[in-house]
From Swiss-Prot:
One GO cellular component term: cytoplasm
UniProt protein name: Serine/threonine-protein phosphatase PP-Y
Active site feature: 121
Catalytic activity, as annotated: O-phospho-L-seryl-[protein] + H2O = L-seryl-[protein] + phosphate; O-phospho-L-threonyl-[protein] + H2O = L-threonyl-[protein] + phosphate
Cofactor: Mn(2+)
Superkingdom per UniProt: Eukaryota
EC number(s) stated in the UniProt entry for this protein: 3.1.3.16
CDD domains reported for this sequence: MPP_PP1_PPKL
Gene Ontology MF annotations: metal ion binding; protein serine/threonine phosphatase activity
Protein source organism: Drosophila melanogaster
């Protein structure tokens, strides 16, 4: 299969970023080549990415393509800004295809400035149920869906920013004793039912009970603020960033501001009326938040003034 030329990648990006609520007209053969090229890029990057700031960190997108474009308009289109996405690109929303194609195109175009982690919805068993499979089957073929899910099986699952900020989609794992265990996860792989990879993509916060708890999702665990504190101390980290749960203001702190949940799909599923958030990490690891308000209600984008230093004095 022929490698995409720079011109072809640019044309994909131009078409997608020019859409105004309509569906893209990318041909299946071109999308297939984009998928294969994305896989070749991500397979040479580790399961635990080690990134430098500045970077914008985004949570769940879930096929809300118009809101993804709003994020880029607010925070800067690549390569003017660096990005780390925490997973859950597909399902729920109406334009998973446009969403994942634009993210893949930017990954191919800017492989060292644009990073994609895996979420629990980047799995065949999940996105076959929650919308992605049906969308791809309706607009193209089941074969193309298989190509996407095969590529998802290569995505990294965690990242370190500036050696001090740990990022993943879901949460922590009782099996995680050394961060290099993450790099030892063999690819390609689907998401297992238990273990480190499962927990990194599925675990949730525990606001009521202590320690590790039962997860109502029926998979993985919940974890409390003491587990967060001990994890950060053990690995000389200052902050944990995760996604996976809707939060009203687009971001929400936990564990005495040692953990923050970032969720980037405003008015999730057209009914939650939540804001979307993006965490902006400066070169000196000062974190601030860009808030994407539900466009149906506010028709605007606002920048939050709440800044959080992650240096030793705080």
């Amino acid at each position: 299969m022929a490698v995409l030329t720079t011109h072809e990648i640019d044309c994909i990006i131009k078409e997608l970023t020019s859409l105004n609520g309509s569906e893209c007209t990318l041909k299946e053969e071109l999308i297939e080549r984009l998928i294969q090229q994305t896989r070749e890029v991500i397979k040479w990057q580790p399961m635990l990415l080690e990134l430098q700031a500045p970077v914008n960190i985004c949570g769940d997108i879930h096929g809300q393509f118009t809101d993804l474009l709003r994020i880029f308009k607010a925070c800067g289109f690549p390569p003017k800004a660096n990005y780390l996405f925490l997973g859950d690109y597909v399902d729920r929303g109406k334009q998973s295809l446009e969403t994942i194609c634009l993210l893949f195109a930017y990954k191919v175009k800017y492989p060292l400035n644009f990073f994609l982690l895996r979420g629990n919805h980047e799995s065949a068993s999940i996105n076959k149920i929650y919308g992605f499979y049906d969308e791809i089957k309706r607009r193209h073929t089941v074969r193309l869906w298989h190509s996407f899910t095969d590529c998802f099986n290569w995505l990294p699952v965690a990242a370190l920013v500036g050696e001090r900020i740990f990022c993943c989609h879901g949460g922590l794992s009782p099996s995680l004793r050394n961060l290099q265990q993450i790099n030892h996860i063999q690819r390609p792989t689907d998401i297992p039912d238990e273990g480190i990879m499962c927990d990194l993509l599925w675990a949730d916060l525990n606001h009521t009970t202590k320690g590790w708890g039962h997860n109502d999702r029926g998979v993985s665990f919940t974890f409390d603020k003491v587990i967060v504190r001990d994890f950060l101390k053990a690995f000389d980290l200052q902050l944990m960033v995760r996604a996976h749960e809707v939060v009203e203001d687009g971001y929400e702190f936990f564990a005495n501001r040692q953990l923050v949940t970032v969720f980037s799909a405003p008015n999730y599923c057209g009914m939650m009326n939540n804001a979307g958030g993006v965490m902006s990490v400066s070169t000196d690891l000062i974190c601030s938040f860009v808030i994407i308000l539900p466009c149906h209600k506010y028709k605007m984008i606002a920048t939050d003034a709440n800044q959080m230093p992650t240096n030793e004095e705080e």
